[in-house]
Design a protein with these regions (language model features):
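Structural signature of Gram-negative outer-membrane beta-barrels, strongest in the C-terminal barrel
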Residues: 1-46, 130-133, 142, 150, ...
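Outer-membrane beta-barrel translocator domains and adjoining extracellular loop/strand segments
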Residues: 1-5, 9-13, 48-57, 102-111, ...
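Outer membrane beta-barrel strand-and-loop segments of large Gram-negative receptors
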Residues: 14, 20, 26, 37-94, ...
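Repeated loop/turn-to-beta-strand initiation elements of outer-membrane beta-barrel proteins
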Residues: 35-40, 87-93, 130-136, 167-172, ...
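C-terminal beta-barrel architecture of Gram-negative outer-membrane proteins
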Residues: 97-102, 117-165, 177, 188-191
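C-terminal beta-signal and adjacent terminal beta-strands/loops
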Residues: 165-207
């Protein structure tokens, strides 16, 4: 796997020996009906360890230092739905909704942000008989934030063809990952004196 990153977006990274421990508390509720599953969870984190950016305006060089972030609250709702469309076609839908809230000092200012986002994954399995199978999967993630950085929508599709050999003792699989190169992580950081964009392209295409 490889990734392409704009070099200027990497900046300089520094450690911090004065970091305090980070503490998280989690509560999760699950409800299951037959093969369907619904999950609700809440996570509260104090002192989350993050990388705080700063910029030299003369050179536009960015530096990142590890610091403790005040408070983060994270809510999630997850739904998993398996279906049997036909005798040879099964489908699974996984949908997740999230709400995250940040509250802390960040880059010298009081930083408060609450936002919603979601993701979904669709998995299809086809059984053609005589040991032949095909899987067609895809996912999508809506725009979201990480601290002051905003990530755009991204997604991907995967295709796999399988053939069972020697009375199911082994399997030959051919896989094509992200053929349309939709899985690109595009983000912008516009906060304080920083205005930058970044693009990361994981190269998952293989066969």
């Amino acid at each position: 796997k490889t990734a392409t990153v704009e070099p200027k977006a990497l900046g300089r990274h520094s450690g911090n020996p004065s970091l305090d421990p980070s503490y998280s508390h989690n509560l999760q509720l699950n409800y299951r009906f037959r093969n369907y599953n619904l999950s609700l969870s809440y996570t509260h984190t104090d002192g989350m360890i993050v990388q705080e950016p700063s910029q030299n305006d003369a050179t536009r060089e960015q530096s990142y230092v590890y610091r403790n972030f005040g408070r983060s609250d994270f809510y999630s709702l997850s739904l998993n739905l398996p279906f049997r469309i036909y005798s040879r076609w099964s489908m699974n839908v996984n949908a997740n909704g999230f709400c995250r809230s940040y509250r802390s000092r960040f880059m010298g200012d009081d930083f408060h942000k609450t936002f919603f986002y979601a993701n979904a994954r669709l998995s299809n399995r086809f059984d053609w008989g005589r040991g032949w199978r095909m899987q067609l999967n895809g996912f999508v993630v809506t725009p979201m934030w990480y601290l002051a950085r905003r990530f755009k929508t991204r997604g991907s599709t995967d295709l796999a063809i399988e053939k069972s050999l020697w009375n199911n003792r082994s399997t030959l699989t051919i896989t094509l990952n992200d053929p349309f190169r939709w899985n690109k992580s595009r983000s912008t950081l516009r906060y304080g004196n920083i205005d930058t964009e970044s693009l990361v392209i994981p190269d998952y295409r293989s066969i």
